[in-house]
Amino acid sequence: MQALVTGGAGFVGTNLIKRLLKEGHKVISLDNYSTGKKENEQDGCKYYELDLSSKSSLGSLDSISVVNQISKFDVIFHLAAKARIVPSIQNPKKSLFNNINSTINILEFVRKNNTPVVYAGSSSSHGDIYANPYTFTKWNGEELCKLYSNVYNLPTTICRFYNVYGDHQLTDGAYCTVLGVFERLHQMGNKEETLHMLVIS
């Protein structure tokens, strides 16, 4: 199988690529390296630095396919996004522009050859989608996938991730996960509330 992974140098993308390579699949990664890291790159995967939200990304995707002699990817895992709620509140334009346009460009690319797309949604979409720009963009991405599936019969799958943690997660900077730096959590409420966590490995 020939797979394309967007956000392949990030936390979830790195773990996915490791699994795909282990199973013997061919993998190409696209990442703008805004949060993805070069040290996450895996032997056996081809990495391309590309801003999927830019107008030129569709032409770049076509060029990558030609260079690698790929007439059609078997599946595209669209993980790339400006993640986290607080940064999206601080810079809404950046999150809105990047997350929405990159999803549109991926869907336009695959519309030509009906490639299945797996979209990385967010559990935050279960709540108030207008609570913050990040949640809105992830919900919007789901709706775009549904639109292209309905109008163009494009095979799409939406995965809503819940509080992910594991190998290759961000452990530095202002917005790293609490688990990543092993900070003790202060439990609030009646101490009977639960939080769903998803291990990525």
Short names for language-model regions:
Residues 1-164:
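N-terminal Rossmann-like NAD(P)+-binding domain of SDR-like oxidoreductases, especially those catalyzing
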Residues 133-135, 139, 143-201:
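NAD(P)-dependent short-chain dehydrogenase/reductase
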